[in-house]
From Swiss-Prot:
UniProt enzyme class: hydrolase
Catalytic activity: ATP + H2O = ADP + phosphate + H(+)
Subunit structure, interactors included: Homohexamer. Forms an RuvA(8)-RuvB(12)-Holliday junction (HJ) complex. HJ DNA is sandwiched between 2 RuvA tetramers; dsDNA enters through RuvA and exits via RuvB. An RuvB hexamer assembles on each DNA strand where it exits the tetramer. Each RuvB hexamer is contacted by two RuvA subunits (via domain III) on 2 adjacent RuvB subunits; this complex drives branch migration. In the full resolvosome a probable DNA-RuvA(4)-RuvB(12)-RuvC(2) complex forms which resolves the HJ.
The entry's keywords: ATP-binding, Cytoplasm, DNA damage, DNA recombination, DNA repair, DNA-binding, Hydrolase, Nucleotide-binding
Full protein name: Holliday junction branch migration complex subunit RuvB
Amino acid sequence: MKLQIKPPNNFAEFVGKQEIINQIQLSIKASRINKAQLDHILLYGPPGVGKTTLARLIASEMNTKLQIIQGGHLQRPSDFLNAVSLIKKGDVLFVDEIHAVAPSVMELMFPVMDDFRVQVLIGKDFNSKMVEMKVNPFTWIGATTQFGKIINPLEDRFGMILNIDYYSNQEIERIVSIYGEQMELELKPEEITQITQHSKQTPRIAIRIVKRLFEQKIVNKKIDLAALFKSLMIYKNGLQSIDVQYLKALNGQYEPQGIKSICSMLGIDKSTVENKIEPFLLRENMIQKTKKGRIITRTGRNYLTSC
């Protein structure tokens, strides 16, 4: 029998974030009783913590369809109008990385979020006219890894704003245990702990390690976490090669470094540095942001010495 990772099918199977789950379930029940459309929801937090999974479970709980679109794909009014024209009453529209939606499209989004209608320009030049387009009522779920880029007029239109943050070690251990059982890995408690310690408190990374561990087992007939972490270039505390390169780049400087200098030293883009590398290093107090730029902390230097 082919073994594969099975994502949660309902809120009961979703590990962690119980207060957020309770709030969502309460709102769904209230909307049913009131026979009203569920309020729009904004989910924000780092990558890999379950924002898309929550959107899927919300749609499932509401017994409706989930439509998914990337914010970066909404760059022209026609992109948005095509998307909402396909929505049926009660559907859930999930816009991932909603901060990437073009400003011209956001102007159309606001009236749709308010009362499900939008003014559309039909025709050209002297023959053009504004026509009101009605949209079927739906629930809008936006997700972002860059909450600071969400403009106030957009933020104000969400009835629920939920922070999906990093997970506790206990929650990650539970996730590793569940998926390890699905893959019949028979993980020992110390192995679960090791995987947790190398997961950056992020479910997506933990699940990725479990998948690679399964591959290792079916090929080599045994589990060797040390060899796996080495092959994946995952270091202590879950830091990856690019994270260590970042720390080494700062460690070799005598003055704070600006984001442009760091990008130049690493050869990667600003968005990757700010959204994929720095959040966890800041959380672990390995780096600090100052007015003059980024600096490595004593914790960061000690990490480089030990890894």
